[in-house]
């Protein structure tokens, strides 16, 4: 709201409806909204599957998800940076610079998330034990976090690619990738593994 900022918004300014801007907002924003809804509904479906396994498994799943979410922070940061830098570069008609920014953001995210993966692999049980003294829950949570640890570099790539695509105005692509990944791969695979194996909670995290 300060007039000295590069982009300032003042309350006394007159806001007039601009159809072109509104259409652009909807075109770019709607897929992002649907992407988040798709992922959230998928998480609900996975939690419902885990609930059917048992109480200890549900508690371990919840606590492991909490511990896991902390490790995503570096990738979220690099993803946001990629979106901003790619959009800025493309707007300046400098696609070569956009590619460089994309590569650096990808590299940084992979390095940080690999380090976070090591923390989850070797310290997963300790992280879960910070939330509960229950030995069974701690053991289950530590086991699934080891699985998650191996996927950390790939999550880093996925998250930064999403940021890059948003910066390049390709939000529909990120929505399709998220929808297919959740509802064509993850949910069906978890369902099949739960029905055909005795792996229990591990099924949801393998998927």
What are these model-predicted stretches?
Residues 1-29, 86-151, 194-207:
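Short alpha-helical transmembrane segments in multi-pass integral membrane proteins
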Residues 14-45, 70-74, 78, 145, ...:
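Hydrophobic faces of transmembrane alpha-helices in multi-pass small-molecule transporters and flippases
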Residues 21-28, 50-69, 136-142, 170, ...:
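Interfacial/gating helices of multi-pass transporter permease domains
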Residues 28, 47, 73-76, 120, ...:
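Structural signal for membrane-spanning alpha-helices in multi-pass inner-membrane proteins
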Residues 33, 37-70, 88, 126-135, ...:
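Helix-terminus/linker motif at the lipid-water interface of multi-pass membrane proteins
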Residues 37, 41, 45, 110-122, ...:
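Generic alpha-helical transmembrane segments of integral inner-membrane proteins
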Residues 61-124, 155-177:
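Small-residue-rich hydrophobic transmembrane alpha-helices
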Residues 161-165, 172-203:
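C-terminal structured "cap/appendage" subdomains that terminate the fold
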